[in-house]
Curated annotation (Swiss-Prot):
The keyword Ribonucleoprotein does not apply. It is found in: Cytoplasm. One of its GO terms (biological process) is aspartyl-tRNA aminoacylation. ATP binds at residues 217-219, 226, 482, 534-537. PROSITE patterns: AA_TRNA_LIGASE_II. It comes from the Bacteria. The gene is aspS. This is Aspartate--tRNA ligase. Catalyzes the attachment of L-aspartate to tRNA(Asp) in a two-step reaction: L-aspartate is first activated by ATP to form Asp-AMP and then transferred to the acceptor end of tRNA(Asp). GO terms for molecular function: aspartate-tRNA ligase activity; ATP binding; nucleic acid binding. Pfam families: GAD, tRNA-synt_2, tRNA_anti-codon.
């Protein structure tokens, strides 16, 4: 039906007869001439109808936005004065000789000339996807997956599929369950990741595996989360953690070079402890120049319990955050930031405004100045590198609250004061995470997952001091987003059972849930390690949007619903009966 795409026509096509298929993007009727912008997935081209082709001109008068049409015509060069530098096809136009209206369009529920609500865009997603910016994002996504496949093939990885209907395992979020008709009362789980299957593939001898795979997690959603998402899943045997990172870093550098024309260079490597200490986050945005600076040793003897208490507590921390040019902040802005950090558990926000550093106490403005000596103030200013016109904010509490509160404040100030370089790419690896974290109920939970190996510890050493264990894990972070994470896996049965025991999984439960894994570990398991990238998040970064729904063709809302198909929906009673399922309605409170 077509010979060319609208958006691919150039001066090299001048004089050629072409047939185009697409949609009317815009129509301008000048009486004796009618111009339309015709659009397909590759872009837009100007088509015009003149009186010499009367039938086509007459039919063109009926055209409206989003009519689906076919046009045959001749490509012509535009006069110099009519060249449109804003269009890729702006040097040419098509003189139409024939027009076919394939399908007409009703009045549109989306307005191309105004900003539509996200609710409307999701309800009429098939129309929203016609917009050039949306089409470009999905084309970029397709390019990314193509580049990934070629790279992985070139590096000896095998694309192997793993099951969608599997067994529920504890991986940190709720599973989506699928009832079995054949085995009434039993359920499959949709995979949160192919974690155990890819480890079993390593045990099967497939030493380099990858898969671009759908995963499912029934969790509370955020702007960068979806209940179903796509992973670039990777596993290797006989490779160390640095070797895995080297290959995966090469993949991401390849993507940025091919898609953005940007060489990311070598990725710096930072420990979890350093990232938390300097940036208050395990996924630091290095485009932001501000850092947290420890000042507890300077404040242990001050007559101000808010500072002195945490400064003398081994579990406490007092940190300072220097804000370049922050002295300009108004009292209301400071109060707003004080309320902001309370979201993260902080009780408030002490500060020092540096007006003229050379004047000592007389050169600062601070509600806590009366508790500080000139020497202490000078030491704080020296350590933070404060200059005239800067602001210093303080966090004083337990270590987690200080990191969370000042880390979040750092990001907010970076954005509010334009301190974060939005034109920069800042990738890094974060390594050496704690193996476990407090579950809030007196027990421990795995910081990554229960199959991550500890660094340099035997099973008996791990059992004795699990709180001290460091995971042989690594996350790739770009511009403050965790785009991928992985680890060296446990390949020893004793170690795996030790980890399960620390997590409170008794031997009977281990056999019920992981018996197949424990059995497989008995038969010559190779050392193995892997990583998974979030394809949706990578695409989000590479297309410059901050909403993950913009890079998924048919995404869910933050309530995990599809507004277009109205999923989820109630099931047919006959189907439920066949599955042996009875829906119990909650009693309404009177």
């Amino acid at each position: 039906m077509r010979t060319e795409y609208c958006g691919q026509l150039r001066l090299s096509h001048v004089g050629q007869q072409v047939t185009l298929c697409g949609w009317v993007n815009r129509r301008r009727d000048l009486g004796s001439l009618i111009f339309i912008d015709m659009r397909d997935r590759e872009g837009i081209v100007q088509v015009f109808f003149d009186p010499d082709r009367a039938d086509a001109l007459k039919l063109a008068s009926e055209l409206r936005n989003e009519f689906c049409i076919q046009v045959t015509g001749t490509v012509r060069a535009r006069d110099a004065k009519n060249v449109n530098a804003d269009m890729a096809t702006g040097e040419i136009e098509v003189l139409a000789s024939s027009l076919t209206i394939i399908n007409r369009a009703d009045s549109l529920p989306l307005d191309a000339n105004h900003v539509n609500t996200e609710e409307a865009r999701l309800k009429y997603r098939y129309l929203d996807l016609r917009r050039p910016e949306m089409a470009q994002r999905l084309k970029t996504r397709a390019k990314i997956t193509s580049l990934v496949r070629r790279f992985m093939d070139d590096h000896g990885f095998l694309d192997i599929e793993t099951p969608m209907l599997t067994k529920a395992t504890p991986e940190g979020a709720r599973d989506y369950l699928v009832p079995s008709r054949v085995h009434k009362g039993k359920f499959y789980a949709l995979p949160q990741s192919p974690q155990l299957f890819k480890q079993l593939l390593m045990m099967s001898g497939f030493d380099r595996y990858y898969q671009i795979v759908k995963c499912f997690r029934d969790e509370d959603l955020r702007a960068d989360r979806q209940p179903e998402f796509t992973q670039i899943d990777v596993e290797t045997s006989f490779m160390t953690a640095p070797q895995v990172r080297e290959v995966m870093e090469a993949l991401v550098r390849h993507l940025w070079l091919e898609v953005k024309g940007v060489d990311l260079g070598d990725f710096p490597v930072m420990t979890f402890a350093e990232a938390e200490r300097r940036y208050g986050s395990d996924k630091p945005d290095l485009r932001n120049p501000m850092e947290l600076v420890d000042v507890a040793d300077l404040l242990k003897s001050v007559e101000f319990a808010v500072f002195a208490g945490p400064a003398n507590d081994p579990k406490g921390r007092v940190a300072a955050l220097r804000v370049p040019g922050g002295a300009q902040l108004s009292r209301k802005q400071i109060d707003d930031y004080g309320n902001f950090v309370k979201i993260y558990g902080a009780k408030g926000l002490a500060y020092i405004k540096v007006n003229e550093r050379a004047k000592g106490l007389d050169g600062i403005n601070s509600p806590v100045a009366k508790f500080l000596t000139a020497d202490i103030v000078e030491a704080i200013l020296e350590r933070t590198g404060a200059q005239d016109g800067d602001m210093i904010f303080f966090g004083a509490d337990n270590k987690k609250v200080v990191a969370d509160a000042l880390g979040a404040l750092r990001l907010k100030l970076g954005k509010d004061l334009s301190l974060t370089d939005e034109d920069k790419w800042a990738p890094l690896w974060v390594i050496d995470f704690p193996m476990f974290e407090d579950d809030g109920e007196g027990g421990l939970t795995a910081m990554h997952h229960p199959f991550t190996a500890p660094r340099d510890m035997t099973a008996s050493e791990l059992k004795t001091a699990p709180e001290e264990a460091v995971a042989n894990a690594y996350d790739m972070v770009i511009n403050g987003y965790e785009v991928g994470g992985g680890s060296v896996r446990i390949h020893n049965g004793e170690m795996q059972q030790t980890v399960f025991g620390i997590l409170g999984i008794n031997e009977q439960e281990q056999r019920e849930k992981f018996g197949f894994l424990l059995d497989a570990l008995k038969y010559g398991t190779p050392p193995h390690a892997g990583l998974a990238f979030g394809l949706d998040r990578l695409t989000m970064l590479l297309t410059g949007t901050d909403n993950i729904r913009d890079v998924i063709a048919f995404p869910k809302t933050t309530a995990a619903a599809c507004l277009m198909t109205e999923a989820p929906s109630f099931a047919n009673q006959a189907a439920l009966t066949e599955l042996g399922i009875q829906v119990v309605k909650k009693a309404e409170n009177n």
